[in-house]
Amino acid sequence: MARTTPLDRYRNVGIMAHIDAGKTTTTERILLYTGRTHRIGEVHDGSATMDWMEQEQERGITITSAATTCFWKGMDGQFEDHRVNIIDTPGHVDFTIEVERSLKVLDSACAVFCAVGGVEPQSETVWRQANKYNVPRIGFVNKMDRSGADFLRVCKQIKTRLGGNPVPMQIAIGAEESFEGVIDLISMKAIFWNEVDQGATYETRDIPIELQGLAKEQYEFMVESAAEANDELMEKYLEESKLSNHDIKKGIRLRAIKSEIIPMFCGSAFKNKGVQAVLDAMIMYMPSPLDVDAITGISDDKDETVVPRKADDNEPFAALAFKIATDPFVGNLTFFRVYSGVLEAGDFVYNSSKGKKERIGRMVQMHSNERDEIKEVRAGDIAAAIGLKDVTTGDTLCDMKEKIILERMEFPEPVIALAVEPKTKADQEKMGIALGKLAAEDPSFRVSTDEESGQTIIAGMGELHLDIIVDRMVREFDVECNVGAPQVSYREAITTMVEHQHKFVKQSGGRGQYGHVYLRIEPQEPGTGYEFVDEIKGGVIPKEYMPAVNKGVQEQMENGVLAGFPLVDIKVTVYDGSYHDVDSNEIAFKIAASKCLSEGVKMANPQLLEPMMAVEVLTPEDYMGDVMGDINRRRGIVSAMEDMPAGKQVKAEVPLAEMFGYSNDLRSITQGRANYSMEFAKYTAAPKNVADEIIEKLNK
């Protein structure tokens, strides 16, 4: 089969935003105008196409990133048919892992902002993630029909609060209830979408007199921004004091692809105004797979050579699995982005991350949760394979002969844990299967067993995250379970350097056990991790026992010394010891190292570390005092306060242990008018009285 759409007509775009900016509604309109849905789905009535899990439809939030393929020829049919692969990402901070995964495989993004709330707390988190992967983006200021809407104010906030460089490509005609349409600054015409056909058609008129001055001013700014793209455009602009429409588009595109500017658009997705122009902007200003740097990976040779993979059907096949989902009808779905080459159904691929061969049986292109079966995928495609057994998120799938590992994704450590137990014997087996599948889908969710109590412990990124996991066990896997109180994942660390030795000797008739080590145990900078150094001279401990010493140290680190929490950020140096020709073995050295570390750490002034959360609260000014008082009561430290259109924004660091049930408390002290976001910031030493209480409770 030949390629049906040339690569330069592909756009892989993520829709990213704050939780209530109207992101899913925007995506729904894109599907309507590109002809993929005939009935508009609305989030508020629970029928949105992209929100296909039951919990999403009930809670009105997007949890998983649904991927959809659609085609667009432009508002006036002015383009060749372009293939747009859209990924709708969740906006809630507990699901930032989903955002991170999808940004990794996209070429560009459309950032949706609320015209009233502007840059809200979650916008900053998502923006940072897009910066990390250097994703070019356009901005869409949505909800222009709402009270307090202001397009240019939001553009200013993007500059001051996100450090972006927004360039308005339109200005709004009216706002709030009188929002009618937009002025397209390139053509300098007013665009009004027809409400009769849900905005499928539009008419252009002259710019209203009262907006001509503002339009001229913004036009000049846009032209100057375009002229800065390269010397050729700058010379033209300086000579003629203007640029042609073609040159403006060229300059804006060049700078947007380099992430130097963010072309900005506005509208109301709910009122069917403006989304069509955003689709045009994706085609005009966002990159195709050919416009972004070739992805690089490490080849499967002993030198681990770095090799690029160009977006080209003739290159060897390489793809990245970025999401696993369990579908009630077909089982496991592995979403993957093809970077190079061609893959046909029935082909074998090599999973270079796991060192295993996989046969690709059926492949589907997803339209939200509807599946179109396909026979092949090519460079630039996003598709899903059915029934792959050993593939997990972040794995590389590649050609059997030309092996490559694309960079792995990094996932955050969970910060909150819950004990879950099945209600009946019948639920027990089902719960094991359910948790296994859910953990395969979501790398920020972990399952473990408490060795002492035998309880199953689930851990994740926040209360909502674990709520939804438990909810899914009931709905999708029919598992009833009891849930314990949330547990905080503490850590332990040392504050001073110690040197200590331990000799492990055991005689019990016949061959004995002998291991003897001297360890220097030192604290490291927070976040540095564990370092093991071998300074043995003259063979006082034979080399073959060193891995056992290292293992003994690491096993003891898992269990800490204060309250059984993992010990972090230490450097352990083996600098002396002794061995016995007959009685020494790996087990003896492992035990000696483990006991030496345990005793040494107790002398190194150990302390308990607690997870601190970066909390941002947006509250009406009337409740400011109560909100601040509540944060202080929770041992929080306020770091910044800022005036916002909707009131005041408070930024603080608060211990996670004090944040349980915060959403209900905040709702009651502000009568439901404040909202907040929270994400893990760092581990810091818990105050002595708090640490003593925790240690005493856990050591009972």
From Swiss-Prot:
Chief location of this protein?
Answer: cytoplasm
Which residue ranges does the record assign to the tr-type G domain? 8-290
Q: Name one GO biological process term.
A: ribosome disassembly
Q: Where in the cell is it found?
A: Cytoplasm
Record-listed GTP binding positions: 17-24, 88-92, 142-145
Task: Give a short account of what the protein does.
Answer: Catalyzes the GTP-dependent ribosomal translocation step during translation elongation. During this step, the ribosome changes from the pre-translocational (PRE) to the post-translocational (POST) state as the newly formed A-site-bound peptidyl-tRNA and P-site-bound deacylated tRNA move to the P and E sites, respectively. Catalyzes the coordinated movement of the two tRNA molecules, the mRNA and conformational changes in the ribosome.
The name of this protein is Elongation factor G
List the source organism: Vesicomyosocius okutanii subsp. Calyptogena okutanii (strain HA)
Give the lineage: Bacteria, Pseudomonadati, Pseudomonadota, Gammaproteobacteria, Candidatus Pseudothioglobaceae
